[in-house]
Amino acid sequence: MSLGLLGNKIGMTQIFDESGNIIPVTILKVGPCVITQVKTDLNDGYNAIQIGYGTVSNKSLTQPELGHLQKSNIQPLKYLKEFRVNNPEEFKVGQVVNVESLSTGQFIDVTGKSSGKGFSGLQKRHNFTRGPMTHGSKNHRAPGSIGMGTTPGRVLPGKKMAGQLGNKVTKTKKLKIIQVNGNENILVVKGSVPGKPGNLVTIHVSN
């Protein structure tokens, strides 16, 4: 796995390409991220790089978090995330990584928390078909049967039922990079990414 990046979703808009076609795009504020720890197979049992993102004040962190960063002489950072890599010797603590490691035309995977939509029924949450609306039917949006009888005498795990929709970590794959702005640390990608504007997102180069 390659080293990823952290950033925030700014929002969606649309741009025109050279042929005049409209392309829906999402604008992401990515990095700069700081490498806070380098883990090796020899010392830690596996190879990984930990990066930090988002400057905050000292009082925003717990003492263990603050001590972890101060040990490497790194300013307080709001988010820490670890990425498995094959070549940790190529990185060093304090190194800054940003959008300049990406290029136009590349494909990336973006992970974030989807927008929460609250308690939702089966039609909205699982795309169930509703019952008849007329002719005396009282089964409009009811779930119907949720299992068998005395045997097994329980509702089987994983049964699709009403409940909270959204607010889960999800990934959108193979998003094409339309534009990279290294000066402003802005990434413009084709399509949508999970979550609302301001949400934290993780960016990986697609396999």
UniProtKB/Swiss-Prot annotation:
Where in or outside the cell? Plastid, Chloroplast
What is its quaternary makeup?
Answer: Part of the 50S ribosomal subunit.
Name the record gives this protein: Large ribosomal subunit protein uL3c
Q: Name one GO biological process term.
A: translation
UniProt cross-references to HAMAP family, sorted A to Z: Ribosomal_uL3_B (MF_01325_B)
PANTHER family (alphabetical):
50S RIBOSOMAL PROTEIN L3 (PTHR11229), LARGE RIBOSOMAL SUBUNIT PROTEIN UL3C (PTHR11229:SF16)
- Function field: One of the primary rRNA binding proteins, it binds directly near the 3'-end of the 23S rRNA, where it nucleates assembly of the 50S subunit.
Q: Which UniProt keywords apply?
A: Chloroplast, Plastid, Ribonucleoprotein, Ribosomal protein, RNA-binding, rRNA-binding
Disordered as annotated region, ranges:
128-148
What is the scientific name of the source organism?
Answer: Trieres chinensis
Cited InterPro entries? Ribosomal_uL3 (IPR000597), Ribosomal_uL3_bac/org-type (IPR019927), Ribosomal_uL3_CS (IPR019926), Transl_B-barrel_sf (IPR009000)
Top-rank lineage group of the source organism: Eukaryota
Keyword Signal attached: no
A GO term for molecular function: rRNA binding
Q: Which family does it belong to?
A: Belongs to the universal ribosomal protein uL3 family.
